[in-house]
Amino acid sequence: MEYSRPQYGRKRMSLGNIIGDPFALATTSIATLAWLISFVATIIAHIQYPVKFPLFAYWALVFYFGLIIGVFVVVASDSTQTYHVALVGYLGCGLVLSTSSVNNLIHDNQGAKEASAAGFILLSMVTIVWIFYFGSAPSAVPRAYIDSFALAKESTSTNRQTMTGGYGGRRPETSTSVQPPQMYTAQLNGLENPSPVGGMTSAMTNPTIPPAYTAPPTQKTAAPNAENPNAEIVPPTEYPYRAKAIYSYEANPEDANEISFSKHEILEVSDVSGRWWQARKESGETGIAPSNYLILL
């Protein structure tokens, strides 16, 4: 059995994804500052009190160093939807490490240890916020509200992202999915028995009975687009809905019906039923867009 394999491409990092997103800029800045406070205070506390110092705090600092870098890279490369599950798992581990470090440092009446504990408390607070953000669906009201403050930024992916993750399979060609159903008529010459006995139908057992209904002979009617199956979809004239793009999308160059759009771009939508919506951009360009990349306003 053959399966269609999705195409993967490396997304280029852009510092604008951090600067243009107030939430990402604020949380990463606070986390970095808290880590620096804990790092410096931990070294000072270890030098002043080397005997009873909890060395466990060093492992927490190393773990959070990689965790903050990972969050920065994921947000900068606009790959949140791809790695959000892994991020939530690592953030959960980091929350355990930071709270344990606070418990080991805050009870001593020593300035350096208390400063280190304060830094770990800030890290714990940022971690809780990150878990809520990355663990929520993009359509969740709190996350959609936070994302609404981010500037529009387009992801520059070298390969087109497939739709297998959202619906479990590839989308059929849209050029043949809108053809009207073909109509067929059959001529009835008499009453027929679907279960003949002895190979004889009801019409043969009593030939004197005239047929109850005889339909006029008709011909098979072909669909209007049967001669040209690759015809493009005719766009509608009314677009009563408005939707906001929660991810960037690059149209398939082999399908003329799809349109590309950037993250946070506003689109007009004519119909919200189905997996693909007929949409129109502000520039007037029309086409179909994946519904799981959009959120209604």
Swiss-Prot record:
Its membrane topology: Multi-pass membrane protein
A Pfam family recorded for this sequence: SH3_1
Transmembrane segments: 24-44, 55-75, 82-102, 115-135
InterPro entries xrefs: SH3-like_dom_sf (IPR036028), SH3_domain (IPR001452), Sho1_SH3 (IPR035522)
Residue ranges of every copy of the SH3 domain listed in the record: 238-297
Reported function: Plasma membrane osmosensor that activates the high osmolarity glycerol (HOG) MAPK signaling pathway in response to high osmolarity.
The protein's name in its UniProt record: High osmolarity signaling protein SHO1
Gene coding for it: SHO1
